[in-house]
């Protein structure tokens, strides 16, 4: 279940399933059942208020309320609007509800131990205001538990944006597949625990819809990993050139360590001659070369991948060097100063991209490079990737990776420990190392983000950037052993 569906794709999955012979009211009953199952798994019987909106999300609420009442729970049900105005499957399930129906209001939250939010689904298109906003505020300030159905009311399912105000849930139960808004900020913060439950929509139906966005997971990229064979040697595993600055040497040293731990066969740090003693003393396995040898280095096709930017410095010299590297059409990772150096002329950078390239901006760098690209993070990453013909990775708690052809992945990892100096340099090194080993740019970016986050999750509080590369071998071993079992 790692595909991510837009709201329109989810509507299409529902439609195809109904056309295939599964009645809509059965899908709604199934939805009510899986939410009921999640509720009784998390809570014992208590006073619950089920808050229903005027659409299918409200119909789910009637199904949930009936199941809870049948199990002896004390249930109050509030409805937005008149029950006579409900249509289709929602009206069918409302007719099966034998309890009282109250007007939707903040009073329903008072005295409740649990609130089930079925007010609005993922397709909400307008800001919540007025009395409904007061209701949401009351829910969020109440000590009761909160379950949201589909998405927390007020969250845009496609973008994660909060439309006015939004319910802050302890548990969100969605159906079939997650939506972008479950993983993109700030919506992700409103969801609490996310449960994705099957309601009878087949995998074949999802395949036919052809999603182009996924939760970043090894299933997405594991087939693209180039594991070394017994007959291989270090030159088969790539030779990465990491370009380092003369003063902020720590950044490129982190790049180098991460790239080598990712499995690259050889690594050379290229820097001003004055800085080479620092780089040479950092790790005996690192090779070094002076910047004066640039032409000879890049004319050697065995040097098949480049990382430039971390600690390198911003300016015309950096711009010129990046353009020369891009002209070679080899695997290239551009980060930090390599991106900022083009802030005044981003079109030159985009025009120069020809080979497999990954751009790894954080939000500030992205805004400087693409000031005219607005919208949610997923939309912006896709637009920038298409414009530049490169894989674009916008870093953050909800990292998004997008390819020029529109494919995208969202990181669902919860790893606040990555907010530390140097972690971005490590990520650039991991991605560069994977590309040097032959992985395509989109897969390398996705795998790099996953390894980076998984390492941080395993290490936990107290993490510093230097810790991340040292944890990579254990994770890579897990992936390798899993690949052997599948073979």
Language model regions located:
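Short acidic low-complexity segments
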Residues: 100-111, 290-299
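Contiguous, small/hydrophobic- and glycine-enriched helical/loop subdomains that border
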Residues: 97
């Amino acid at each position: 279940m790692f595909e991510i569906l837009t709201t329109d794709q989810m509507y299409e999955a529902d439609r195809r399933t109904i056309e295939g012979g599964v009645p809509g009211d059965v899908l709604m009953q199934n939805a009510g059942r899986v939410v009921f199952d999640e509720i009784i798994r998390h809570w014992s019987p208590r006073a619950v208020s089920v808050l229903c909106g005027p659409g299918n999300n409200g119909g789910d609420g009637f199904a949930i309320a009936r199941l809870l009442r049948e199990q002896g729970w004390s249930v109050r049900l509030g409805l937005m609007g008149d029950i006579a105005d409900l249509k289709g499957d929602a009206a069918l399930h409302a007719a099966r509800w034998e309890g009282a129906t109250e007007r939707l209001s903040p009073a329903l939250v008072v005295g409740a131990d649990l609130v089930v939010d079925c007010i609005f689904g993922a397709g909400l298109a307008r800001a919540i205001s007025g009395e409904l906003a007061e209701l949401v505020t009351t829910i969020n300030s109440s000590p009761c538990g909160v379950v949201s159905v589909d998405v927390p009311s007020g969250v845009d399912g496609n973008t994660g944006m909060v439309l006015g105000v939004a319910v802050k849930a302890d548990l969100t139960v969605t159906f079939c597949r997650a939506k972008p808004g479950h993983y993109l900020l700030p919506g992700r913060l409103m969801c609490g625990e996310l449960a994705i439950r099957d309601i009878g929509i087949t995998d074949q139906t999802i395949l036919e819809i052809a999603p182009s966005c996924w939760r970043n997971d090894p299933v997405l990229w594991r087939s693209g990993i180039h594991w070394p064979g017994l007959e291989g040697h270090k030159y088969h595993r790539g030779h990465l050139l990491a370009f380092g600055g003369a003063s902020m040497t720590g950044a490129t040293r982190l790049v180098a360590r991460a790239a080598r731990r990712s499995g690259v066969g050889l690594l050379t740090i290229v820097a001003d001659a004055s800085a080479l003693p620092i780089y040479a003393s950092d790790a005996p396995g690192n090779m070094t070369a002076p910047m004066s040898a640039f032409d000879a280095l890049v004319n050697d096709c065995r040097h098949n991948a480049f990382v430039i930017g971390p600690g390198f410095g911003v300016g015309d010299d950096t711009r010129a060097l990046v353009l020369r590297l891009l002209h070679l059409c080899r695997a290239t990772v551009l980060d930090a100063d390599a991106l900022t150096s083009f802030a005044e002329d981003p079109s030159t950078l985009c025009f120069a991209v020809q080979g497999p390239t990954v751009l790894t901006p954080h939000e500030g760098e992205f805004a400087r490079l693409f000031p005219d690209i607005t919208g949610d993070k997923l939309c912006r990453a896709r637009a920038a990737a298409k414009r530049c013909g490169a894989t674009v990775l916008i870093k953050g708690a909800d990292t998004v990776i997008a390819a020029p052809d529109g494919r995208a992945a969202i990181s669902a990892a919860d790893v606040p420990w990555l907010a530390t100096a140097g972690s971005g340099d490590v990520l650039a090194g991991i991605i560069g190392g994977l590309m040097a080993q032959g992985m395509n740019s989109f897969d390398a970016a996705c795998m790099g983000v996953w390894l980076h986050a998984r390492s941080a999750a395993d290490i936990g509080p107290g993490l510093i950037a230097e810790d991340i590369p040292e944890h990579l071998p254990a994770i890579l071993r897990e992936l390798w052993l899993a690949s052997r079992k599948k073979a």
